[in-house]
């Protein structure tokens, strides 16, 4: 007697296709997903059809959201939604709509609500987080931009840490980097989408930067914060990515002073420009290149962890017993494991990292 509702990005993009799947009771898109309970009630009363998607251009409001769960030490706070970029491989603008943001005042109110739940760390999230400040029906950003937002958040005493989830390299300017380096609350951890180490491929992807800018961003971060953690997104197997172009990506990533990679195989998406690009890369080659970069990521992470051995760092311990161990993260996103002690749950402790165990965790 279960009721199956499909909501979110996929439902917005492929509502008709999903509705034909046996057992699906309801499909609702981006604008209507926040009325899920209301739609379920109407379905039971036979008042509406099972499909309700919309023209994504009509999604013209910001819906606040943050995560709070049992035994959580971190909360994820959405400050921005949608994207105005037109990357040739991406369906996010079609699924999530235009870039739009919450107000700084409301964000601060939500941070205080989160703090009352005992949360120690807030992760600032968005579809294009660095574009914060964009308002509907406006051709320019609000005077309250991302830099001003993090300045305001840094003054909140009830939260110990703020972490930026991901930020585009062209939006990660020197002012933001320098501010984080001096911040009381924002931790030295950046996750920056690269997607390719080949300028030719970046241009085909219609990204808003080339490798020189990306290298500059990484070097600037390390100049101000030598112990910072830098994660990078990369896509392999994009149409036209020859062996030479992939080698350029590998070599570029090899010399970058970064800490880990998130590697994605390119996958075709309907209604994207890249879907019609020639020189499609076979799936086996995509998989091979993905594995190569995942191995590089393991080496990068191990090297970064080793560079922190002997240093005293602040560890936020998670509130969960994992087979006799407790895990946590340092401010610069090193995963630490220690023997279970309930008194450590949801506490921040300054400890010296002593070694790396066989599972890849740092020990204290």
Q: Model regions: which residues?
A:
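Proteins enriched for Cys/Gly/acidic motifs involved in redox and nucleic-acid/cofactor modification
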Residues: 1-132, 145, 175, 190, ...
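Residue-level signal for inorganic ion chemistry
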Residues: 9, 36, 124, 164, ...
């Amino acid at each position: 007697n279960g009721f199956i509702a499909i909501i979110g990005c996929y439902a917005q993009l492929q509502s008709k296709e999903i509705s034909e799947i046996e057992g699906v009771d309801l499909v609702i898109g981006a604008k209507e997903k926040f009325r899920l309970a209301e739609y379920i009630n109407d379905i039971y009363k036979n008042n509406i059809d099972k499909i309700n998607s919309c023209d994504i251009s009509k999604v013209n409001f910001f819906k606040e959201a943050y995560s709070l769960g049992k035994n959580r030490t971190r909360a994820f706070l959405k400050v921005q939604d949608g994207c105005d970029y037109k990357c040739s491989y991406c369906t996010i603008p079609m699924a999530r709509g235009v870039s739009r943001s919450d107000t700084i005042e409301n964000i601060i109110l939500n941070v205080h609500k989160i703090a009352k739940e005992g949360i120690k760390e807030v992760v600032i999230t968005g579809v294009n987080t660095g574009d914060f400040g964009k308002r509907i029906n406006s051709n320019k950003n609000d005077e309250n931009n991302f830099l001003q937002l993090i300045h305001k958040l840094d003054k909140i005493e009830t939260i110990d840490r703020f972490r930026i989830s991901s930020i585009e390299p062209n939006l990660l300017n020197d002012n933001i980097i320098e501010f984080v380096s001096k911040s009381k609350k924002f931790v030295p951890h950046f996750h920056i989408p690269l997607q390719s180490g080949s300028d030719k491929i970046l241009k085909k992807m219609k990204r808003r930067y080339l490798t020189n800018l990306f290298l500059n961003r990484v070097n600037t971060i390390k100049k101000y914060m030598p112990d910072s953690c830098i994660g990078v997104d990369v896509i392999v197997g994009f149409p036209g990515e020859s062996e030479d172009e992939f080698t350029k990506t590998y070599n570029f990533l090899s010399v970058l002073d970064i800490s880990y990679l998130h590697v994605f195989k390119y996958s075709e998406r309907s209604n994207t420009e890249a879907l019609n690009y020639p020189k499609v890369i076979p799936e086996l080659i995509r998989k091979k290149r993905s594995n190569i970069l995942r191995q590089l990521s393991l080496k990068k992470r191990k090297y970064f962890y080793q560079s922190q051995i002997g240093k005293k760092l602040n560890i936020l311990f998670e509130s969960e017993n994992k087979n006799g161990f407790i895990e946590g993260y340092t401010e610069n996103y090193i995963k630490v494991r220690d023997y279970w002690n309930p008194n450590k749950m949801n506490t921040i402790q300054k400890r010296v990292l002593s070694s790396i165990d066989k599972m890849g965790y740092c020990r204290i």
